[in-house]
């Protein structure tokens, strides 16, 4: 590839609306161009990177025994209604009508369509197990697209769907896919972690995420120093709290006229924040099943909404209004507690709160809190659940200490069980000739997201630093004055061919730019290896070589250069 014949359009300006480093650098490098909110055109340069990720993904999926197919991105409403996700998916599901007023959606994921394909193609257990995968564009109507292709509305994804007669077989394929994903991200040259996760809107019995480690990551990842335990914040669990200590104080009312937060109350009373209890008022359910719920966490902790939604009866809830708070508690926000409610309420306390003694909580009276409060003596024992976010320093289940890092989710694997197959009546005949609902797994990788995540992990002030496997070219041969010196141009072309013959993905920068501008472009677009061919170097029988990760260039003869690049 000669760059004089390639569309390479870099810019020096930093886009004002680009918040993440990857977004800024992809725009400056000319990898993407914005078409509309959350929609991006991939340039020839960006597409080279995208295709390299695709190739590795396909190779490892094929190696793992999956077979490629292709599902339409436009899918009928009826299919999504059968699983209940037409409504449940919410406004992220882009809904459209054709000229006959038939309603469709632009697929954000393809469990329904994959299951529909399987039920039409598979009739016997002898055809199982099977794992179908595709690399296909998806669309989610994000309310606020941001961060470039990191959270765009349209994105490229590899999604796979496996079908099984028995759960044991599903578990084996799940482990097979976890291994395949680990190979994919290892080959891409990324520092990644696999963590336990919540299944979210897709559902299922078990799921794990793959995250690229990056300080800019949106997700908090939790690790233990005592084992290989790892989970995202939504699913992370700390060890049980120590047993509750005996009461040592009498309950008393304290004057807190303007102190409405746990922090302010703790400061006023001169106590540690962890001795206070935070009360969150919610309304769960609808109609006759509606109930007022007071959720309690320690003052220095935060409610984990995912864990809370798994508590019986709390899968659908909202914050209570001030009018509802007044009706049920006879109080106002800032002074709430599980104390003498005006009407019957449900109290759900985090495990840590249930283990507290001599704590401080709102008195349900404006301007007052209660101190020295104890369960059993002053308040009835609450319903107990794990409903908080863990924190760095918490004790892990394995006895180690929990640590927290930031990550960018790039892959997710699920054991779906029979949720979709039952809804869509996807059955095969088993060994006894009886209809059996198939067990299902699904496995996704955000291919376009991987590109942005790799940049977040691999960059410096000059630009992108691609891992070799993802770079648009592994090596670029830069020619000094290609039009003015035929010998230099010929030597560069000859070297390019030798690099290709050696199996390297190489390009020739023969655009005739000034050396400084040419080198700056190569650093910006992240070329791992730069070789300079110049009249002076040829005279000495050497080439100037610089690794993108090195601070200085070095002069090498051809044999040493080829050995270095192939090593």
Swiss-Prot record:
Its main location: cytoplasm. SUPFAM superfamilies: Class II aaRS ABD-related, Class II aaRS and biotin synthetases, YbaK/ProRS associated domain. GO terms for biological process: prolyl-tRNA aminoacylation. GO terms for cellular component: cytosol. It is found in: Cytoplasm. Keywords: Aminoacyl-tRNA synthetase, ATP-binding, Cytoplasm, Ligase, Nucleotide-binding, Protein biosynthesis. This is Proline--tRNA ligase. It comes from Stenotrophomonas maltophilia (strain K279a).
